[in-house]
Amino acid sequence: MSKEEIIQAIKGMSVLELNELVKACEEEFGVSAAAPVAVAGGAAAGGGDAAEEKTEFDVVLKASGSEKIKVIKAVREVTGLGLKEAKALVDGAPKPLKEAVSKEDAEAIKAKFEEIGAEIELK
């Protein structure tokens, strides 16, 4: 079977079949499909210009400001937390709101909270 035939066979598979294929390959060869991601992340962190290449950010609530109720509502909306948990997060600031989010999402969350007077930091 040639590479092209294998590729054509893979193209014809459903997502469920592809998932089963990946699991079977992991078992057969004793590897994990997630391992290369961890290795690549470690290599990027060791580079000198890793800060310029950062693609994931943590959104941290530094202070709630004067509109605490609006901030609690926004925390619930962004995180999906219940009222009690959202209030505890706001009361315990500085606390992380969301972790490992894309730059666009992090900027949108920051803008939303700053609009209602909260202080947000992106890490």
UniProtKB/Swiss-Prot annotation:
GO MF terms, alphabetically ordered: mRNA binding; structural constituent of ribosome
Q: Biological process (GO) annotations?
A: translation
Keywords of the record: Ribonucleoprotein, Ribosomal protein
- One Pfam family it belongs to: Ribosomal_L12_N
UniProt cross-references to Gene3D superfamilies, sorted A to Z:
3.30.1390.10, Single helix bin (1.20.5.710)
Instruction: Spell out the InterPro entries in the cross-references.
Output: Ribosomal_bL12, Ribosomal_bL12_C, Ribosomal_bL12_C/ClpS-like, Ribosomal_bL12_oligo, Ribosomal_bL12_oligo_N_sf
Quaternary context: Homodimer. Part of the ribosomal stalk of the 50S ribosomal subunit. Forms a multimeric L10(L12)X complex, where L10 forms an elongated spine to which 2 to 4 L12 dimers bind in a sequential fashion. Binds GTP-bound translation factors.
**Name of the featured protein:** Large ribosomal subunit protein bL12
* Natural source organism: Clostridium kluyveri (strain ATCC 8527 / DSM 555 / NBRC 12016 / NCIMB 10680 / K1)
Q: Which gene encodes it?
A: rplL
